Amino acid sequence: MAARHHAFILAGTGSGCGKTTLTLGLLRLLQKRALRVQPFKVGPDYLDTGWHTAICGVASRNLDSFMLPPPVLNALFCEQMRQADIAVIEGVMGLYDGYGVDPNYCSTAAMAKQLGCPVILLVDGKAVSTSLAATVMGFQHFDPTLNLAGVIVNRVASDAHYQLLKNAIEHYCSLPVLGYVPPCDGVALPERHLGLITARESLVNQQSWHDFAATLEQTVDVDALLSLSVLSALPTGMWPERPDNTAGAGLTLALADDEAFNFYYPDNIDLLERAGVNIVRFSPLHDRALPDCKMIWLGGGYPELYAAELAANTVMLKHLRAAHQRGVAIYAECGGLMYLGSTLEDSGGEIHQMANIIPGHSKMGKRLTRFGYCEAQAMQPTLLAVPGEIVRGHEFHYSDFIPETPAVMACRKVRDGRVLQEWTGGWQTGNTFASYLHVHFAQRPEMLQHWLATARRIL
């Protein structure tokens, strides 16, 4: 197995079709076969990767073609494959759903072509028979250049039902049906307004997933799946120039990591560590002091669910304000922005005092605000960019931030060649920068260089 590279993308007909649940079961099942698995997720989602990591113990990585140029994304993929026998890549939304109407832009299908990976299509078998072959045929012929290698059927009532579906699909589509997923209520993933509950919040019942993997072992032809997943070659990639391991030497970064703040791309943390930065984790919820540091990173998460506890930890808020006043280079994304604001109004209308470093008020709403990919151009110097530089990222939040100071980034959402929305966002005060944008540092090496340079000036 080690002599060959194996990978496949598990795609679906749409969101909510069971991709994440099956991905988790297959990760556990392949590990039972003593294979070194490397999970990936197409797109920017943090929640699915968190579940991947919790189930198999290996940090799952995001493959996002909006934020990352193809050579960089390919290099990221190849780097993780060095220590893996097989990559299990969970797709995003439906197979051909991307950013806009072009099925070859930011879609699962586009990622499969870029990486040269076969696609396994997950389809819903509930209350259907031969008509399911028509569904599969539509996906098969929509893009004949795509390597659609096999099918797995979800929500199958019985083996007899499965045989009916399998025979229809294989007869009319000439595609192998690799197995099915029976109803398994014990592994249903909990959800709330932002999608799945994080694996960190949910007590992962490892025995349930062990049992689910045992079920899949009986209903999915894993040997056939492995045979189909052999790659002829790994994609060609190239990292941009990265900060060398002396750029961050002597710098310590305090990383907020608890129930309220835990949305981070592992690649970003890797890049910081490779630059020589010492990373120390702390909890804004539970700790009474900050680590001794010259950099602080407050990532995304769910501060609105823990607003009372965050507000009650006045000692931590005081230490954060003192760090800001000393010039510590503080970077905050989404939930981190809400925490650094003056106040946070939760969904019940209760207002909580926050750090008051970025003057402004966060208020929870009932609908997503500016959801999706966007570009942000610096209008003045910021922690991550100088004027004119463009940062690509994504926003996913139900809150809105009402600032008391002008924003420093010009943001816009462009889809299918049209500007859909323009706004300003991102706030810089002293050496602190916060915005709703989630970013991947590998898109622009300058982002880390700016942050490290700011931190080094205060040594």
Model-identified regions with their sequence ranges:
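ATP-dependent carboxylate-amine ligase catalytic core
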Residues: A2-L115, V119, V123-G150, D159-Q163
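A short, charged/proline- and glycine-enriched loop
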Residues: A3-H6, T246-T252
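Beta-strand->loop->alpha-helix junctions that form or flank phosphate-binding loops
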Residues: K41-V42, V177-D185, N278-L285
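C-terminal and late-domain segments of enzyme folds
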Residues: A112, T246-A249, F261-L271, N278, ...
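A short helix->loop->beta-strand "cap" motif at the edges of active sites that frequently abuts
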Residues: C117, L175, Q325-A329
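Internal gly/pro-rich beta-alpha loop/helix module
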Residues: S129-N245
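Phosphate-binding active sites in nucleotide-utilizing proteins
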Residues: A249-Q325
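Cysteine-nucleophile active-site neighborhood
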Residues: P303-L383
